[in-house]
Curated annotation (Swiss-Prot):
Enzyme kind, highest EC tier: isomerase
Subcellular location: Cytoplasm
Name the record gives this protein: Chaperonin GroEL
Main location: cytoplasm
SUPFAM superfamilies per record: GroEL apical domain-like, GroEL equatorial domain-like, GroEL-intermediate domain like
Protein purpose: Together with its co-chaperonin GroES, plays an essential role in assisting protein folding. The GroEL-GroES system forms a nano-cage that allows encapsulation of the non-native substrate proteins and provides a physical environment optimized to promote and accelerate protein folding.
Gene behind the chain: groEL
Reactions that this protein is recorded to catalyse: ATP + H2O + a folded polypeptide = ADP + phosphate + an unfolded polypeptide
InterPro entries: Chaperonin_Cpn60_CS, Cpn60/GroEL, Cpn60/GroEL/TCP-1, GroEL-like_apical_dom_sf, GROEL-like_equatorial_sf, TCP-1-like_intermed_sf
Subunit and interaction comment: Forms a cylinder of 14 subunits composed of two heptameric rings stacked back-to-back. Interacts with the co-chaperonin GroES.
Residues binding ATP, per UniProt: 29-32, 86-90, 413, 476-478, 492
Family to which this protein belongs: Belongs to the chaperonin (HSP60) family.
EC number from the UniProt entry: 5.6.1.7
GO BP term, example: protein refolding
Length: 541
């Protein structure tokens, strides 16, 4: 397939046109007075959103060279979203500003490599300065404030802070669509896995069809139990305690299942059997998680353990277990807090090294189940369009809140970027590297300029006043007032701000040092069929 190639200034200018088209579309959404963008969908109603990364992903340009520029900025938004979960519009605005200023200087004869070196040095200095002024986030009220700023809704802020309080910072918080019009929070405390009872005769509540076990022992094994004799000694020991038993095994079949059911129906003792969750190596890991949580031991050949030799010491315990036809929930396992903390740290280290998105998701689920539970925010709205938009806002708010808890917060509304300009300006560089530093200094103003513009104010006037104000004092674009940003609750997670700047500088530097661009040549349009010819005649000879 033939290729089109452009060089030097021609190549860069083509890409920058794409950068500008995408950035101009996205940046109208920045700030409390940001506008919405309507996205056409192939099926269903259009999506109305102010989420930067969602808009960026939808943009596809006809010109191949311009499209490459747009896709690079879209990558900045996606990368920032992956790392910090928010700040995608800020990242896009910063990228455009660095590229635009950089291109002017490269066109005027500056060395792009020197400029890039200056951009990198200035970005590193700005990030260090941001981290130095970051304030930690703790407490339900502070968390609610961060979430409310990101979602533009105090109610959503309250839901997220309550969810994080209930399941912990490492807990899983999922966002689902509600069947009603109201948004609500539902929390499943304890460890839940998607396996239900093996027989409906094991239920303790025939109306709700659930089995509730109070203070049960828990047998955990990766073996199949077919012969009741394998576990008979253990059952006799449990029977003496008059406490219920939960069996988690690869399967329970053969004579074992009807024998257990018969004893349950007769009231000999309360027992429920469920299949082990997961498959393969993941099943082994999840069984070990359950064992750590409940203070038990996994009966497995990997450890040289046999069911017939198992003692009461191998059984786990919990305050309560609830089993329905689809799920099992273990509440307040009896495992030691030290063992659980060690297991959590092991999973966290695996999270840091994994490259698979699927593995990452499963590890996060395991981490949450060990850490405390799962919270579900069920989003309700009057229309499908409003529901989609609300769901995106809540996802952004949740990600921003997690980022804030992780690395702290700085003054919002672009104020923190203006406040670190003095540190960047003090960076001693010369030649083209100094030009790169100055490009970053100009770019640091751009988020404030755009927020002010979207709210109907003159950006340059706001920036001048901001530079002469005390650190932390900024412009509240929602009210038009000058306030202490953090005290007023106008805040940004430092992880979001620094990720936006780092990713913007990285991609902008690549665009400025581009000397050639290779794109696929458009295919010539197929010739139209001559008018009046009957398609059925073709090939009819």
């Amino acid at each position: 397939m033939a290729k089109d190639i452009k060089f030097s200034a021609d190549a860069r200018e083509s890409m920058v046109r794409g950068v500008d088209i995408l950035a101009d579309t996205v940046k109208v959404t920045l700030g409390p007075k940001g506008r919405n963008v309507v996205l056409e969908k192939a099926f269903g109603s259009p999506l109305i959103t102010n989420d930067g990364v969602t808009i960026a992903k939808e943009i596809e340009l006809e010109d191949h060279f311009e499209n490459m520029g747009a896709k690079l900025v879209s990558e900045v938004a996606s990368k920032t979203n992956d790392i910090a979960g928010d700040g995608t519009t800020t990242a896009t605005v910063l990228t455009q500003a660095i590229v635009r200023e950089g291109l002017k200087n490269v066109t005027a004869g500056a060395n792009p490599i020197g400029i890039r070196r200056g951009i990198e040095a200035a970005t590193t200095t700005a990030v260090e300065a941001l981290k130095a002024v970051a304030q930690p986030v703790s407490g339900k009220e502070a968390i609610a404030q961060v979430a409310a700023v990101s979602s533009r809704s105090e109610k959503v802020g309250d839901y997220i802070s309550e969810a994080m309080e209930r399941v912990g910072n490492d807990g899983v918080i999922t966002i689902e669509e509600s069947r009603g019009m109201e948004t609500e929070l539902e929390v499943v405390e304890g460890m839940q896995f998607d396996r239900g009872y093996l027989s409906q005769y094991m239920v303790t509540d025939n109306e709700k069809m659930v089995a509730d076990l109070e203070n049960p022992f828990i047998l955990i094994t990766d073996k199949k139990i077919s012969n009741i004799q394998d576990i008979l000694p253990l059952l006799e020991e449990v029977l003496k305690t008059s406490r219920p038993l939960l069996i988690i095994a690869d399967d329970v079949d053969g004579e074992a299942l009807p024998t257990l059911v018969l004893n349950k129906i007769r009231g000999t003792f309360n027992v429920v059997a469920v299949k082990a969750p997961g498959f393969g190596d993941r099943r082994k890991a999840m069984l070990e998680d359950i064992a750590v949580l409940t203070g038990g031991t996994v009966i497995t050949e990997d450890l040289g353990l046999e069911l017939k030799d198992a003692t009461m010491a191998a059984l786990g315990q919990a305050a309560k277990v609830t089993v329905d036809k689809d799920n099992t929930v273990i509440v307040e396992g009896a495992g030691s807090s030290e063992a659980i903390a060690n297991r959590v740290n092991l999973i966290k280290s695996q999270l840091e090294t994994t490259t698979s998105e699927f593995d990452r998701e499963k590890l996060q689920e395991r981490l949450a189940k060990l850490a405390g539970g799962v919270a579900v925010i069920k989003v309700g709205a009057a229309t499908e369009t409003e529901l989609k938009e609300m769901k995106l806002r809540i996802e952004d708010a949740l990600n921003a809140t997690r980022a804030a808890v992780e690395e702290g917060i700085v003054a919002g509304g672009g104020t923190a970027l203006i406040n670190v300009m003095d540190k960047v300006a003090a960076l001693e560089l010369d030649g083209d590297a100094a030009t790169g530093r100055n490009i970053v200094l100009r770019a640091l103003e751009e988020p404030v300029r755009q927020i002010a513009y979207n709210a109907g104010y003159e950006g340059s006037v706001i920036i001048d006043k901001l530079k002469n104000s005390a650190a932390g004092v900024g412009f509240n674009a929602a009210t038009g007032e000058w306030v202490d940003m953090i005290a007023t609750g106008i805040i940004d997670p430092v992880k979001v701000t620094r990720s936006a700047l780092q990713n913007a500088a990285s991609v902008a530097g690549l665009i400025l040092t581009t000397e050639a661009v290779v794109a696929t040549k458009p295919e010539p349009a197929a010739p139209a069929m001559p008018q009046g010819m009957d398609p059925g005649m073709m090939g009819g000879f």
